């Protein structure tokens, strides 16, 4: 009969219950020792499996499963299952527990009890796990501890189970090299060498290399490059997730942590614990009045019995650690700052070999330098060196993916060959003379494609063979790790063979392969990671076009002012200034810590201020909606300032971010339009000062948003009454311009005006400008009609008629749009509904001589260009 819960540990009780379930599953009427053994050894993390691994024993699962399968079945399945005479081995288990002085029956007692069954004992002996060997392994695992807790089995070798030996990883060469950070490493070692309070805590922003410092200390311990007090110590990284996982019962988490701490305390050589994200121990495991992890650590930390390296971010240190003064006092802070671009380049150069070996590609030094520079300039919401390393890693992954796919030239030819072969098969079935002639031509085409394809495939295979061999040789450079291990272990013969024979041969072969690849001028396979690959990754992440300009982009930028002129009529000065600013930015010559450009557009309503901003967005992003538009008439109250940067803490909407900061934070390359800026409350302008000067703004959550890649435009109607003079000349325009600027200076404060790159005054639209506006408006109507298959054509006299009846000098171009919508677009809509417009037809709008009303004529099958 199985023991009650109070007589067994949780693991033992679970094993006995699972053995009963195993017997029921196999339709056995009783529980055999083989059922219990199978359950124990199936649990890979259980004590029984750990004993077998410690003994390097063979597998026992298959013979045990065969033994269970050979047991007699009972049909129908029995309702109750009992233990066989030796299935529970209950008397022996109780006797074994009493013999060693244990309060509860544990899994190790079950394991020893299995040897009372002759069949199970034979299986264990065949796997080289005799009873004596198992008892010895259990004694070594228990280390003299008595079974007094229901969770006892989980506490055997707790340090190995709930922590990772960083020194072991360093010995095996599995840790990345730590470049630089000498001051922080030495400061940490000095704190560890103290008598009391020898617990450093690494504090820094996420991604600056806190964990790398702990790994660097592990590598120094392995090399012996540490003070005598740290020689032969081991550095373990505590896995809090493994400690907490599965600890559903009260007290289970505390038992696990106490067993880890006791092993650390009792270790002969000394153990240093590294706890990443140490703020998590504050409150970890706390529930229903039980202690949290921090309170278990505090006494040992204070007495110097436990040496711990913690790591956390500045924000989490302030939020969690500083609130627990007793916990904070037991640690000495070591601040880890973000490395400079030069230091980051050194770090990347040190890691380059690892990434080359992993991805099987070559990384140029230019790519390393550009990765650090672009990461520093454009990826502003993360920290070095983490963001630069990620850039290199993703660029390598992209090149590796391209290496794994066939070149486009070969792919096109192979598809063409398959199509021709399918056509040839179809033609072979056709007996007509024309088909036979066509078949000859198709076979000739297949022959020609094969002749073109064969050398390409041969060249591709040769290049892939070299690259695959290069990757294999780079991975074999792990022999350097064996060299370091041989030197540490004093195996000088092996070290000499590796240093003067094996490693030089590998390096010579790598050098030879790289030279062969370099000599090939036109390659089908690109295995190098260049600065262009890194820039492409930055462009994908941020939307900022930092990749090298293609010929199309060059022509587009050089002709930018011409494209803008087509859309914005009569504002030559404004267009030229905006185009010049964009060219400076795309050439990489804009100031690094300020917006790409900042303008104040002044002028009367309807002259093209907002239209020019839309045109810039359309030219840069192919979509005029791709801009952040802030209508300043919505910010007339003083309290509305918070909407730009986000509501303060404690207010509704704090987590949603600001209407200005959030779009720019997510899409840092954008056009930001502050429309009708004079209508906002004066306090709103204070928010803009830092944006215009330093290209940065801190939102309500303390995050710095980078505006250095934005074009900022403010529009205003201030002083527009001075520009409505119909008799304007170039000389009078300068006077009028000064009057407008005087009005602006009297309204806006000097600190705002002084931060703008340029103040552009838009001219009043002249008659010839308005003709171009009419053309643009009709082009917009034709764009809307394109999907219906219609187009509109205006006679010359119609434009004058529209200007005469639709133009208002004080209102600019907007009245023209309203007039065209009312008198032309409405008539087109009426004709469409009445089905008076056949498909693919042109609607000609004309004005009869002496007439006062437009007429509409329809021509089918002609475009507006073909209609004379």
UniProtKB/Swiss-Prot annotation:
Chain positions recorded as ATP binding sites: 204-211, 603-610
- Has keyword Chaperone? yes
Kindly indicate whether the keyword ATP-binding belongs to this entry: yes
| Lineage: superkingdom | Eukaryota
Q: Where is this region: I?
A: 159-407
All residue ranges annotated as the Clp R domain in the record? 4-144
The record's annotation in PROSITE patterns points to:
CLP_R, CLPAB_1, CLPAB_2
Q: Could you cite one Gene Ontology molecular function of this protein?
A: ATP hydrolysis activity
One Pfam family per UniProt: AAA_2
Spell out the residue ranges making up region: Repeat 1.
8-75
Which UniProt keywords are given for this protein, alphabetically ordered? ATP-binding, Chaperone, Nucleotide-binding, Repeat
GO BP, sorted A to Z? cellular response to heat
Entries under InterPro entries matching the protein: AAA+_ATPase, ATPase_AAA_core, Clp_ATPase_C, Clp_N_dom_sf, Clp_R_dom, ClpA/B, ClpA/B_CS1, ClpA/B_CS2
Outline the segment boundaries, as ranges, of region: Repeat 2: 83-144
User: Among the entry's GO cellular component annotations, what is one?
Assistant: cytoplasm
Q: Where is this region: II?
A: 529-720
Sorted alphabetically, which SUPFAM superfamilies does this protein's record hold?
Answer: Double Clp-N motif (SSF81923), P-loop containing nucleoside triphosphate hydrolases (SSF52540)
Q: Which family does it belong to?
A: Belongs to the ClpA/ClpB family.
Q: What is this protein called?
A: Heat shock protein 100
Q: Which organism is it from?
A: Trypanosoma brucei brucei
